[in-house]
């Protein structure tokens, strides 16, 4: 096989059918839309979710819950992630440099999944009790900001 011998698979490249350009084309007059009716009209068609008059799914299902306006999204880091990063100091700046978070506005929470084998100094927004104990056990410092 050579680059100059590459060909498209037969049938994969078909020309778009041009409709409404005269009877001789075979796709003139109604231009494949049929006669009359909502879908034959300009701008015709049904709205998304319309089920032909049957009560649509979004109205059959109950309204549940709400989205809190004060919700805070935390970037979750586990002890195993800190081990993988291999940094001595974990804070917003070091995580931005490692491309874990995008900016200082990100909130960070550390959880205790995995194990940690080396000393790490941590400066984060939230930390679980188990993660805090694991870091301090190895001689690291934990600062909640």
Swiss-Prot record:
Family per record: Belongs to the universal ribosomal protein uL15 family.
GO CC terms in record: cytosolic large ribosomal subunit
InterPro entries: Ribosomal_uL15 (IPR030878), Ribosomal_uL15/eL18 (IPR021131), Ribosomal_uL15/eL18_sf (IPR036227), Ribosomal_uL15_bac-type (IPR005749), Ribosomal_uL15_CS (IPR001196)
Disordered: annotated segments: 20-54
Designated name of the protein: Large ribosomal subunit protein uL15
GO terms (BP aspect): translation
Protein's gene: rplO
Keywords on record: Ribonucleoprotein, Ribosomal protein, RNA-binding, rRNA-binding
Biased composition regions of type Gly residues, renumbered to the chain: 42-52
Organism lineage: Bacteria, Bacillati, Mycoplasmatota, Mollicutes, Mycoplasmataceae
The keyword Ribosomal protein is annotated on this UniProt entry: yes
Species whose genome carries this gene: Mycoplasma mycoides subsp. mycoides SC (strain CCUG 32753 / NCTC 10114 / PG1)
Pfam families per the UniProt record, alphabetical: Ribosomal_L27A (PF00828)
Complex formation: Part of the 50S ribosomal subunit.
NCBIfam families: rplO_bact
Functional description taken from the UniProt entry: Binds to the 23S rRNA.
MF terms in GO: rRNA binding; structural constituent of ribosome
